[in-house]
Regions:
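Aromatic- and acidic-residue-enriched segments that line the glycan-binding/catalytic groove
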Residues: 19-67, 127, 152-165
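Aromatic- and glycine-enriched glycan-recognition loops and surfaces
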Residues: 1-15
Length: 172
């Protein structure tokens, strides 16, 4: 009803989606679909927190350790980090986003914590989304304030070549 009534008044609805993490009370934590559904599944014995430093994405000389800690670490103990490198997790997230577009008729997606999810998975998701819905509105939250860092995440950016995020719009 919310979307139908909003559309009747000329209001568009943008849904906030989060592919990076979920809450610790989610059913997936209590009954994991597979052992690598999350990054750092042994978090109770060996918790790894993200470094919150996005520079390993843009630094070609960043160590694998720094990149892994930033990308695979959890925000906090209450926010399990989803493993988008797992093909089942990835496919679920893609299908779930398509379901919301088709079922609920949402007008756009704001992707929360875009850089903290797996880069290749997010790039592929955007590619699939753009192929299925070429004019769809999607914006990625990057959590960076410098224009050059923000531009790195933009689709077809020369700064991130040969990689391509396929993300049409970014915000800090």
């Amino acid at each position: 009803q919310l979307i139908e009534k909003s559309h009747a008044r000329g209001i568009k609805i943008v849904m906030d989606m989060i592919f990076n993490h979920c809450g610790v009370e989610h059913v997936w934590i209590k009954d994991m679909p597979c052992k690598d559904w999350f990054n750092n599944p042994d978090h109770e014995k060996n918790f790894v927190q993200t470094s919150f430093k996005l520079t390993p994405h843009v630094d070609p000389y960043a160590s694998k350790y720094d990149f892994s800690q930033m990308n695979d670490g959890w925000f906090v103990t209450a926010m399990p980090d989803l493993n988008q490198k797992n093909p089942h997790v990835y496919r679920y997230l893609v299908q779930n986003s398509f379901w919301w577009i088709e079922y609920a008729n949402i007008d756009g997606i704001r992707m929360d914590t875009y850089p903290y999810a797996d880069y290749d998975a997010m790039s592929n998701w955007m590619k699939e989304l753009n192929e299925e819905y070429p004019n769809y509105n999607t914006v990625g939250e990057t959590w960076v304030t410098e224009p050059a860092y923000t531009a790195w995440w933009q689709k077809d950016s020369k700064l991130s070549a040969p990689k391509n995020s396929n993300l049409k719009t970014v915000m800090d």
